[in-house]
Amino acid sequence: MIDLYFAPTPNGHKITLFLEEAELDYRLIKVDLGKGGQFRPEFLRISPNNKIPAIVDHSPADGGEPLSLFESGAILLYLAEKTGLFLSHETRERAATLQWLFWQVGGLGPMLGQNHHFNHAAPQTIPYAIERYQVETQRLYHVLNKRLENSPWLGGENYSIADIACWPWVNAWTRQRIDLAMYPAVKNWHERIRSRPATGQALLKAQLGDERSDS
């Protein structure tokens, strides 16, 4: 059983996508960010950076004590290696998958997060910041589109943790002031992932938002 400490953000959705695809048993534990749940001492013991997602794996592969982990990229890599799913053992596809996973956690996520902040959450309108992050968002979508024009999935021939990491951020394209039709390869990729049964299940459980066990 895996406890997933979760809020319905792109980073949170990454982990539910993987858990549903892998059909792992997990309990969804909502962290109320609006009420400061991320600062509670019991959560900080699991995620000292006071961010979601975080997991506690009660059945780690080494058979030892429960293993806690924070940072969405680290969690995806851990789960992929534990299950043998969504990360190729072939050298080149594995390298490409990790490359695009790290591109997401180091670039796509932070920049789109700033786009969202200055468009929707900043206490005052700052035209320079809005324009800066809009231009960078468009650049990143262009990079993603170029990759997907030449490869069915980000890592290569197979759906992987790189796709799982990027999709929830792209799924918020309307709030990023992006016209997805301008990026046809991204649009096709987004629709293919949205149509996967596990994606629907993951989004449904996130919408329910209560603690529950998938068994």
Swiss-Prot record:
Gene deletion effect: Deletion of yfcG decreases the resistance of the bacteria to hydrogen peroxide.
Domain GST C-terminal as annotated: residue spans: 90-215
Record GO cellular component, one term: cytoplasm
EC numbers: 1.8.4.-, 1.11.1.-
Domain of life of the native organism: Bacteria
Keywords recorded for this protein, A-Z: Oxidoreductase, Peroxidase
Keyword Oxidoreductase in record: yes
Effect of N11A: Loss of GSH transferase activity
Key word Lipid metabolism present: no
Phenotype when changing T9A: No effect on GSH transferase activity
Domain GST N-terminal: 1-87
Binding positions (glutathione 1): N11, Q38, I52, E71, S72
GO biological process, any: response to oxidative stress
SUBUNIT field: Homodimer.
Record protein name field: Disulfide-bond oxidoreductase YfcG
Source organism of this protein record: Escherichia coli (strain K12)
Gene coding for it: yfcG
